[in-house]
Swiss-Prot record:
Motif (CXXC): 311-314
TM region positions: 586-606
Motif CX6CC per UniProt: ranges: 530-538
Annotated function: The surface protein (SU) attaches the virus to the host cell by binding to its receptor. This interaction activates a thiol in a CXXC motif of the C-terminal domain, where the other Cys residue participates in the formation of the intersubunit disulfide. The activated thiol will attack the disulfide and cause its isomerization into a disulfide isomer within the motif. This leads to SU displacement and TM refolding, and is thought to activate its fusogenic potential by unmasking its fusion peptide. Fusion occurs at the host cell plasma membrane.
Record's protein name: Envelope glycoprotein
Gene Ontology biological process terms from the UniProt entry: fusion of virus membrane with host plasma membrane; symbiont entry into host cell; virion attachment to host cell
Residues bearing glycans: N43, N58, N301, N333, N340, N373, N409
Entry keyword set: Cleavage on pair of basic residues, Coiled coil, Disulfide bond, Fusion of virus membrane with host cell membrane, Fusion of virus membrane with host membrane, Glycoprotein, Host cell membrane, Host membrane, Host-virus interaction, Lipoprotein, Membrane, Palmitate, Signal, Transmembrane, Transmembrane helix, Viral attachment to host cell, Viral envelope protein, Viral penetration into host cytoplasm, Virion, Virus entry into host cell
Annotated site (Cleavage): R444, E445, L624, V625
Amino acid sequence: MESPAFSKPLKDKINPWGPLIIMGILVRAGASVQRDSPHQVFNVTWKITNLMTGQTANATSLLGTMTDTFPKLYFDLCDLVGDNWDDPEPDIGDGCRSPGGRKRTRLYDFYVCPGHTVLTGCGGPREGYCGKWGCETTGQAYWKPSSSWDLISLKRGNTPKGQGPCFDSSVGSGSIQGATPGGRCNPLVLEFTDAGKRASWDAPKTWGLRLYRSTGADPVTLFSLTRQVLNVGPRVPIGPNPVITEQLPPSQPVQIMLPRTPRPPPSGAASMVPGAPPPSQQPGTGDRLLNLVEGAYLALNLTSPDKTQECWLCLVSGPPYYEGVAVLGTYSNHTSAPANCSVTSQHKLTLSEVTGQGLCIGAVPKTHQALCNTTQKTSDGSYYLASPAGTIWACSTGLTPCLSTTVLNLTTDYCVLVELWPKVTYHSPNYVYGQFEKKTKYKREPVSLTLALLLGGLTMGGIAAGVGTGTTALVATKQFEQLQAAIHTDLGALEKSVSALEKSLTSLSEVVLQNRRGLDLLFLKEGGLCAALKEECCFYADHTGVVRDSMAKLRERLNQRQKLFESGQGWFEGLFNRSPWFTTLISTIMGPLIVLLLILLFGPCILNRLVQFVKDRISVVQALVLTQQYHQLKSIDPEEVESRE
């Protein structure tokens, strides 16, 4: 059993390496930022670069999530190598400078060794991390090098038949059969393995590539693979909290000025050029709230004018500020991420109240299946599901306009198609007036009607479906568009507020840790700040990262123990773990079943013994009955008879 980490008082555990520990904790805290939604779409760029020349062999950009942006990368070996392998005599040796050298290079095998994880004895960059046989993990060679843990696989691509000595079609050799642009005739295909799709690509990964020759040394080149996420915003600097600075009061209503007749400019005056209009200011909190209430009124007035003759619309001041109504709708399927999926949204907002029944996608748990009228399973493949106009996907990871099927197939995430409505309650005038009247008798608590109950489901089947009866579709009106614009503006502000608060907290922790590190350096002679103060050392742990990682490791260990426990059980013990009703059924019928089995096994033997015993007793009784009907004759001795005569 392991000893506890703090078996002695903390003041006796002062570490002379405290500043270095603080530096490590600072780096760890800076990296533990809350992760985005798995359905967030980014602009991802993969680059293959020759580390010896700095030349880029391939740069592929695509839109997608961080889970499915692992495309096949196509490039030419000579674009990667350049002139590093050229021999002094181009007509004899291989290389990439001459057409003949490119053709001879195509005949050689090659092998690749990883530099991001170097095994013992594999050497360094000079050997291409291939210091001995067995270090190679991929390539195109007769011994078929492979690995189950490396991140990529690199093979030769399809070379067209009849492609001659690799002439360059752009320098006057276009009429020669087999000529290609740039003389490229050594195509390579790089694919990501399952381990590569799970790995972290925060830093470049390095590999060494060597050309296999039967004689002489194998030429070496080094290349790196880098992933760049272009639209991830930078971290905010230390300063005022933008969440507080944007809390502006409601704007004052603008006074309408009557138009005046323009006067001609005086003679000799220079013509005045109107300046550029001032930049539009982002609406403050007060304006956003008023826009929500105004949009709710316009939408309600369009659908039910009788309810808006005299009413009170109250915006709920406490969370949840929004509620969703599950609806049925037809989403659009895209092979690539559409434009509305690539917005820079962090998807950190969730819905705590969803009502109704609608369309569900993914592995919906039993606790949320009441929200599903129809549950669809995603098929294999990488594509995106965009929500219809006026709706959004409410997922267990947050709100998102698009879904990635790759994320749904790899995780336990689930989503429901919902309409978003602000938490605005509708009250009649009698209820509001009654709150200010002093009454001794109180009526029953009135039922609060929210905007979701009054207008829920309109975009997917309410007013929008009433066009045939003469009703205007709400989704196509300015009132609904104004309400949707107010909702989107408020949601965007909420997301920015959450991100700003998170980054402000992280920045504050970095400042505190930096001050602590500086104090430790100042009191280095005394053994650090804790030793100078003669107090226990306190260390900072970012719960958003450390706890999440710890729980993930704990969950992984529990799964491993569960699998180990199940593998150690016999088939009979495993039957009882499959379902609870099976255990109850077995325990109920086990007793009668055992009794019946014993009767079938020993019943015939016992029955035969009993029958034989009865037969013996009956035979004895019969013998006694027969002896009672006869008398026994006396025996006479012949000698005695003769003596009597």
